[in-house]
């Protein structure tokens, strides 16, 4: 079966399982890497952070589906994980959800801002580095991610 078809079927089932478990799908990848084929499913918890238990329960259900459907003809590794502490910020929902968190935003013109997300209103992200506040239009963001705090 072609990789795109596998990915589509896996994503559909992954979204169903995630919804049942109160989770969301952040990303689904199916690719050949140096150690062989990897089916990587990244789950997210909209109410907080993803626990090891979340990954374990999701993985069990996904394995049942994959074994039953037998979509993948060759050997592969199933990886289930969270987006990580330095997760990418992908859109308005993430900026609202992570208000108060430390983030790094790189704009399309190459400027980099590191600070706490103060708000997201009408397409504008307000971020503060403790000394100054910056307002960044979401359309100007090239990439953004949370920063790990120690």
Swiss-Prot record:
GO cellular component: cytosol
Disulfide feature: none
NCBIfam families for the chain: PRK14638.1 (NF011231)
Family under the similarity heading: Belongs to the RimP family.
One Pfam assignment: DUF150_C
Name of this chain's protein: Ribosome maturation factor RimP
Gene3D superfamilies: Ribosome maturation factor RimP, C-terminal domain (2.30.30.180), RimP-like superfamily, N-terminal (3.30.300.70)
Job of this protein: Required for maturation of 30S ribosomal subunits.
Location of the protein in the cell: Cytoplasm
Keyword Cytoplasm attached: yes
Lineage of the species this protein comes from: Bacteria, Thermotogati, Thermotogota, Thermotogae, Thermotogales
GO BP: any one term: translation
InterPro entries the record matches: Ribosome_maturation_RimP, RimP_C, RimP_C_sf, RimP_N, RimP_N_sf
Main localization, broad class: cytoplasm
């Amino acid at each position: 079966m072609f990789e795109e078809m596998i990915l589509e079927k896996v994503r559909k089932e992954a979204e169903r399982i995630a919804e049942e478990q109160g989770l969301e799908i952040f990303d689904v990848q199916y690719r050949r890497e140096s150690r062989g084929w990897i089916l990587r499913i990244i789950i997210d918890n909209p109410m907080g952070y993803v626990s090891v238990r979340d990954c374990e329960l999701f993985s069990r259900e996904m394995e049942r589906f994959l074994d039953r459907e037998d979509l993948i003809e060759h050997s592969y590794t199933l990886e289930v994980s969270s987006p990580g502490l330095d997760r990418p910020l992908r859109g308005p929902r993430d900026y609202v959800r992570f208000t108060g968190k430390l983030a790094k935003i790189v704009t399309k013109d190459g400027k980099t801002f590191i600070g706490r997300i103060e708000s997201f209103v009408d397409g504008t992200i307000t971020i503060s580095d403790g000394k100054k506040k910056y307002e960044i239009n979401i359309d100007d963001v090239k990439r953004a991610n949370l920063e790990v705090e120690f």
